[in-house]
Amino acid sequence: MALGSNTKFYETPNHPFQGERIADEANLIGRYGLKNKEELWRAQSELRGYRREARKLLGSAGEHETESEEFLARLKRYGILNEQDQLDDVLSLDVTDVLERRLQTVVYRKGYANTPEQARQFIVHGHIVLDDARVTRPGMTVETAVESSVGFDEHSSLSDELHPERAEAQE
């Protein structure tokens, strides 16, 4: 690996043993089917970056108007913010807002899998397509425009409606 290339895309907690934080992390890992705490910390770092950018843009109100519009448009495109939300609303985001936009969670919420863990397995094994392209990264952030194109690969055995591993229709 080249010198100076950043291989760590998250920050670990400052204090290693805080019971409440550890319990909250375990709850989120279980609810979203994350592989390990590193994935959760990556989402927290992503959220931290969004907040940092919002504070920077709020501090220089008026000077960087196009940058703030582009920043808001990006967050709205990913579905992290609603269409009516403003720059102030970025500061009130929670890590669950970021985790809800992961491909793994979208596949589970759309009813293609019974559990988030099963959704992760379907993605990693190449059964899920996004815009007719096979995707094998469960942590990928899904844009709202392409969310409707999530489905099973036509060459996958799971594309059969009667496959035993297919999820029941969730209401």
From Swiss-Prot:
Chain ranges of the S4 RNA-binding domain: 101-165
Pfam families named in the record: S4
CDD domains: S4
Disulfide topology: none
Disordered, as annotated region: 148-171
Keyword Ribonucleoprotein belongs to the record: yes
Keyword check for Ribonucleoprotein: yes
Ranges of biased composition (kind: Basic and acidic residues): 152-171
Gene3D superfamilies: RNA-binding S4 domain
Any one GO MF annotation of this record: rRNA binding
Record's GO cellular component terms: small ribosomal subunit
SUPFAM superfamilies from the UniProt entry: Alpha-L RNA-binding motif (SSF55174)
GO biological process terms held by the UniProt record: ribosomal small subunit biogenesis; translation
Keywords: Ribonucleoprotein, Ribosomal protein, RNA-binding, rRNA-binding
Highest taxon of the lineage: Archaea
Described purpose of this protein according to its UniProt entry: One of the primary rRNA binding proteins, it binds directly to 16S rRNA where it nucleates assembly of the body of the 30S subunit. With S5 and S12 plays an important role in translational accuracy.
Subunit structure: Part of the 30S ribosomal subunit. Contacts protein S5. The interaction surface between S4 and S5 is involved in control of translational fidelity.
Protein family membership: Belongs to the universal ribosomal protein uS4 family.
Protein name stated in the entry: Small ribosomal subunit protein uS4
Organism whose genome encodes this protein: Haloarcula marismortui (strain ATCC 43049 / DSM 3752 / JCM 8966 / VKM B-1809)
Organism classification: Archaea, Methanobacteriati, Methanobacteriota, Stenosarchaea group, Halobacteria
Gene giving rise to this polypeptide: rps4
